[in-house]
Amino acid sequence: MNPRRKKRLTLAVALIGGVAAIASLLLYALNSNLNLFFTPTEIVQGKKDTGVMPEIGQRIRVGGMVTIGSMVRDPDSLHVEFAVHDAAGGEIIVTYDDLLPDLFREGQGIVAQGVLSAPGKLEATEVLAKHDENYMPPEVAEAMGQSHEKLDYSEDQSKAGGYK
Protein backbone atom coordinates (compact mmCIF):
# COMPACT_ATOMS: atom_id res chain seq x y z
CA MET A 1 0.00 0.00 0.00
CA ASN A 2 1.44 3.32 -1.01
CA PRO A 3 1.71 6.18 1.53
CA ARG A 4 -1.03 8.25 -0.11
CA ARG A 5 -3.58 5.44 0.06
CA LYS A 6 -2.54 4.61 3.63
CA LYS A 7 -3.07 8.26 4.64
CA ARG A 8 -6.57 8.27 3.09
CA LEU A 9 -7.49 5.01 4.81
CA THR A 10 -6.29 6.33 8.19
CA LEU A 11 -8.29 9.53 7.68
CA ALA A 12 -11.45 7.58 6.74
CA VAL A 13 -11.13 5.26 9.77
CA ALA A 14 -10.58 8.26 12.09
CA LEU A 15 -13.58 10.06 10.59
CA ILE A 16 -15.86 7.02 10.98
CA GLY A 17 -14.63 6.49 14.55
CA GLY A 18 -15.26 10.15 15.42
CA VAL A 19 -18.79 10.06 13.99
CA ALA A 20 -19.53 6.84 15.90
CA ALA A 21 -18.22 8.35 19.16
CA ILE A 22 -20.30 11.51 18.71
CA ALA A 23 -23.42 9.48 17.88
CA SER A 24 -22.98 7.23 20.92
CA LEU A 25 -22.47 10.22 23.25
CA LEU A 26 -25.55 11.91 21.78
CA LEU A 27 -27.69 8.81 22.27
CA TYR A 28 -26.42 8.41 25.83
CA ALA A 29 -27.28 12.03 26.66
CA LEU A 30 -30.75 11.75 25.14
CA ASN A 31 -31.45 8.48 26.95
CA SER A 32 -30.45 9.84 30.35
CA ASN A 33 -32.70 12.90 29.93
CA LEU A 34 -35.70 10.95 28.68
CA ASN A 35 -38.67 11.08 31.06
CA LEU A 36 -41.31 8.51 30.23
CA PHE A 37 -44.93 9.14 31.21
CA PHE A 38 -46.79 6.47 33.18
CA THR A 39 -50.14 6.22 34.94
CA PRO A 40 -50.25 4.64 38.41
CA THR A 41 -51.73 1.44 36.92
CA GLU A 42 -48.90 1.24 34.37
CA ILE A 43 -46.33 1.60 37.14
CA VAL A 44 -47.90 -1.27 39.08
CA GLN A 45 -48.93 -3.59 36.20
CA GLY A 46 -46.93 -2.41 33.19
CA LYS A 47 -48.06 -0.74 29.96
CA LYS A 48 -51.03 -2.38 28.24
CA ASP A 49 -49.42 -2.80 24.82
CA THR A 50 -45.92 -3.87 25.78
CA GLY A 51 -46.07 -4.81 29.46
CA VAL A 52 -43.09 -2.52 30.04
CA MET A 53 -42.73 -1.46 33.67
CA PRO A 54 -40.44 1.31 34.90
CA GLU A 55 -37.30 0.17 36.68
CA ILE A 56 -36.24 1.21 40.17
CA GLY A 57 -34.07 4.32 39.81
CA GLN A 58 -35.64 5.29 36.48
CA ARG A 59 -36.65 8.92 35.99
CA ILE A 60 -40.36 9.08 35.09
CA ARG A 61 -43.44 11.28 35.07
CA VAL A 62 -46.69 10.04 36.56
CA GLY A 63 -50.12 11.60 36.24
CA GLY A 64 -53.36 10.99 38.04
CA MET A 65 -55.65 12.23 40.79
CA VAL A 66 -54.48 12.83 44.37
CA THR A 67 -56.34 10.32 46.55
CA ILE A 68 -58.60 12.05 49.07
CA GLY A 69 -57.41 11.52 52.64
CA SER A 70 -53.95 10.30 51.63
CA MET A 71 -51.86 13.43 52.21
CA VAL A 72 -49.48 13.28 55.19
CA ARG A 73 -47.31 16.31 56.01
CA ASP A 74 -44.27 16.38 58.28
CA PRO A 75 -44.85 19.28 60.70
CA ASP A 76 -41.11 19.97 61.05
CA SER A 77 -40.20 20.11 57.35
CA LEU A 78 -41.59 20.52 53.85
CA HIS A 79 -41.79 16.74 53.40
CA VAL A 80 -45.19 15.57 52.18
CA GLU A 81 -46.42 12.14 51.12
CA PHE A 82 -49.61 11.44 49.19
CA ALA A 83 -51.17 8.77 46.99
CA VAL A 84 -52.01 9.23 43.31
CA HIS A 85 -54.57 7.02 41.58
CA ASP A 86 -56.14 6.68 38.16
CA ALA A 87 -59.47 5.49 36.75
CA ALA A 88 -58.17 1.93 36.32
CA GLY A 89 -57.63 1.60 40.07
CA GLY A 90 -53.83 1.76 40.21
CA GLU A 91 -52.33 3.74 43.07
CA ILE A 92 -48.79 4.80 43.96
CA ILE A 93 -47.23 6.79 46.79
CA VAL A 94 -45.48 10.07 45.95
CA THR A 95 -43.04 11.78 48.33
CA TYR A 96 -42.01 15.40 47.82
CA ASP A 97 -39.64 17.62 49.81
CA ASP A 98 -40.48 21.09 48.57
CA LEU A 99 -43.34 23.58 48.47
CA LEU A 100 -46.42 22.22 46.74
CA PRO A 101 -48.12 24.37 44.07
CA ASP A 102 -50.85 26.71 45.32
CA LEU A 103 -53.51 24.79 43.37
CA PHE A 104 -52.51 21.43 44.84
CA ARG A 105 -55.15 19.66 46.94
CA GLU A 106 -56.63 16.22 47.38
CA GLY A 107 -58.89 15.08 44.57
CA GLN A 108 -57.09 17.22 41.97
CA GLY A 109 -55.22 16.07 38.88
CA ILE A 110 -51.44 16.34 39.04
CA VAL A 111 -48.32 15.36 37.15
CA ALA A 112 -45.29 14.45 39.27
CA GLN A 113 -41.78 14.00 37.91
CA GLY A 114 -39.09 12.15 39.77
CA VAL A 115 -37.31 8.86 40.37
CA LEU A 116 -38.99 5.55 41.12
CA SER A 117 -37.43 4.63 44.47
CA ALA A 118 -39.33 1.38 45.15
CA PRO A 119 -42.16 -0.53 43.49
CA GLY A 120 -45.14 1.83 43.67
CA LYS A 121 -43.19 4.71 45.26
CA LEU A 122 -42.01 7.87 43.49
CA GLU A 123 -39.61 10.44 44.97
CA ALA A 124 -40.79 13.55 43.15
CA THR A 125 -38.53 16.43 42.20
CA GLU A 126 -41.38 18.40 40.64
CA VAL A 127 -45.15 18.43 41.17
CA LEU A 128 -47.49 20.23 38.78
CA ALA A 129 -51.14 20.85 39.67
CA LYS A 130 -53.97 21.49 37.25
CA HIS A 131 -55.00 25.09 36.63
CA ASP A 132 -58.75 25.04 37.25
CA GLU A 133 -61.60 22.61 37.76
CA ASN A 134 -61.98 21.95 34.01
CA TYR A 135 -58.30 21.56 33.13
CA MET A 136 -56.46 18.27 33.15
CA PRO A 137 -52.92 17.80 31.82
CA PRO A 138 -53.13 16.27 28.32
CA GLU A 139 -51.11 13.18 29.28
CA VAL A 140 -53.34 12.52 32.28
CA ALA A 141 -56.57 13.08 30.33
CA GLU A 142 -55.44 10.71 27.58
CA ALA A 143 -54.18 8.06 29.99
CA MET A 144 -57.33 8.18 32.09
CA GLY A 145 -59.57 8.17 29.03
CA GLN A 146 -61.00 11.51 30.17
CA SER A 147 -63.14 9.62 32.66
CA HIS A 148 -62.56 11.99 35.55
CA GLU A 149 -65.51 13.74 37.11
CA LYS A 150 -65.72 17.01 38.98
CA LEU A 151 -65.50 16.21 42.66
CA ASP A 152 -67.63 17.90 45.29
CA TYR A 153 -65.62 19.03 48.29
CA SER A 154 -66.76 19.39 51.86
CA GLU A 155 -66.26 22.68 53.70
CA ASP A 156 -63.21 21.25 55.53
CA GLN A 157 -61.55 20.04 52.32
CA SER A 158 -62.08 23.40 50.63
CA LYS A 159 -60.50 25.23 53.58
CA ALA A 160 -57.55 22.81 53.67
CA GLY A 161 -56.88 23.49 50.00
CA GLY A 162 -56.84 27.25 50.54
CA TYR A 163 -60.20 27.88 48.85
CA LYS A 164 -63.30 29.53 50.28
Swiss-Prot record:
The family this protein is said to belong to: Belongs to the CcmE/CycJ family.
Gene Ontology CC terms, in alphabetical order: plasma membrane
Keywords per UniProt: Cell inner membrane, Cell membrane, Cytochrome c-type biogenesis, Heme, Iron, Membrane, Metal-binding, Signal-anchor, Transmembrane, Transmembrane helix
Presence of the UniProt keyword Iron-sulfur in the record: no
Protein purpose: Heme chaperone required for the biogenesis of c-type cytochromes. Transiently binds heme delivered by CcmC and transfers the heme to apo-cytochromes in a process facilitated by CcmF and CcmH.
Name recorded for this polypeptide: Cytochrome c-type biogenesis protein CcmE
Ranges in the topological domain labelled Cytoplasmic: 1-8
NCBIfam families noted in UniProt: PRK13165.1, PRK13254.1-3
Residue ranges of the TM segments: 9-29
InterPro entries to which the protein is assigned, alphabetical: CcmE, CcmE-like_sf, NA-bd_OB-fold
Provenance organism: Shewanella piezotolerans (strain WP3 / JCM 13877)
